[in-house]
Amino acid sequence: MNDVDKITGFLDSIAFSDGSAGNSKRNDIDKEGFFYHTTQKAWGGMALFNNDIARYRNHLMCELCIRYEITVLYSVVMPTHTHDVLYSKNWRNISDMYRVLNSSLVRYVSHRYPQRKGLRLFCERPQYTVIREMLHLFFLGKYVEDNASSRENEGKNAPYSCFWMFENGHFQPPYNKDIYEALFGIPFKELYEFYKTHSKKEVWV
């Protein structure tokens, strides 16, 4: 069974009901969901992620997501933080993936940038928000895309943005171009065009 079949099957049984979203402050994590918006902030708001570190993070995260059977819907790396929208049958898989990812990032940064060796890089663990409404999941695509495009509008770049795949149609695992139509009833190209031409307020409404 491929990712699209899995998600389509789960959509028949998942209750995207009241939109209540547990987050990861202290022990308040809702571990019963399938879709999560996760953020990871750099310690003290430092501009941790340059292009090199962002590329390494994306490459390793893709490998780990395949290993842990996680599907990535959206991902951007900003200089001071990251945004990922993920699907997994088991929240523990996501948690384990980030544990390995962040440990590897610390080692990579210490090796490549000796001046940062021994420094704290991250604000504790990632923040997890479970997604229980389809509208919320749909909106997050625009929210994540807006992070990257806002940098471009300022003449800067997001160190990494997954939306190059939406532009050229070349999706790589753990992404899957067919998932967006399975979820939202709209092909990825039309979805991306909608995100680019509508504001966050328009997408939410």
Q: Which residues make up each language-model segment?
A:
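Short Pro-Cys-Gly-centered "Cys-loop" motif that presents a nucleophilic cysteine in a tight turn
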Residues: 1-78, 87-205
